[in-house]
């Protein structure tokens, strides 16, 4: 075992459940994520916020080990496991689930087939019955092609598909994008329930007020750098901070 792994294992009881430390990511020569560090406690929701182009999605993709952007320096840990040493499929097996902004519903497959496909490789997480209990609309449309669902229903399917894996960290990129307020409220209630079951979540959302009301803590990025880390309530109460970095 390496000195790095020994050190981490020895301090595991004190280490945060999730942490990224001084991560630097690039799209080819473009320096996107510039030395970002933060941690998330188990069962916590963290809102990752900032203006357009701040590096939010790039940070999520770096955590998920998508390879684009490429992590060139820094460490990422989840429950004692070094994500920074993993490829994307290894990070998924380790418990990372990314729900991208475009949801990536697979054409030609039904709702149920989209979920079943995610469970082909172990370890698996929530059962179909549990997912349908969480999202009754999916149960009603289980035999319908996934890409024919409404935007809100596709978002439910994308989240349900992620939960069907043995998930430890849920990464959500713009989950409220294009959704009616009533559907946003439904998704919020779902995320609150998932949190009550111990799920750790990082949410990137342009609707900063909605994300802050949901989250326990917040991180704000500006041009790829971290400019704030603290309680979500403090951001809601700090007009100057909101105006300067979130334009709200």
Which residues fall in each region the model found?
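Glycine-rich phosphate-binding loops of nucleotide-dependent enzymes
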Residues: 2-248
């Amino acid at each position: 075992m390496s000195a790095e792994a020994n050190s981490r294992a020895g301090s595991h009881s004190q280490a945060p459940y999730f942490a990224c430390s001084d991560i630097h990511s690039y799209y080819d020569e473009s320096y996107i994520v510039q030395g970002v560090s933060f941690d998330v406690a188990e069962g916590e929701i963290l809102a990752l916020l900032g203006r357009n182009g701040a590096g939010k999605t790039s940070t999520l993709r770096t955590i998920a080990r998508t390879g684009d952007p490429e992590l060139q320096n820094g460490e990422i840990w989840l429950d004692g496991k070094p994500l920074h040493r993993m490829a994307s499929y290894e990070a998924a097996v380790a418990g990372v689930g990314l729900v991208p902004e475009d949801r990536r519903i697979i054409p030609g497959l039904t709702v149920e087939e989209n979920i079943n496909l995610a469970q082909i490789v172990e370890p698996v997480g929530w059962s179909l019955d549990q997912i349908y209990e969480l999202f009754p609309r999916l149960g009603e449309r289980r035999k319908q092609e996934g890409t024919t669902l409404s935007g809100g229903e596709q978002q439910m399917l994308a989240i349900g598909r992620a939960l069907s894996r043995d998930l430890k960290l849920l990464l959500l990129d713009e989950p409220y994008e294009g959704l009616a307020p009533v559907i946003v409220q439904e998704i919020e209630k779902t995320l609150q329930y998932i949190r009550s079951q111990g799920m750790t979540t990082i949410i990137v959302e342009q609707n900063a007020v909605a994300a802050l009301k949901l989250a326990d803590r917040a991180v704000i990025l500006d041009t790829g750098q971290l400019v704030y880390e603290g309680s979500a309530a403090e951001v809601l109460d700090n007009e100057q901070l909101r105006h300067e970095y979130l334009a709200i």
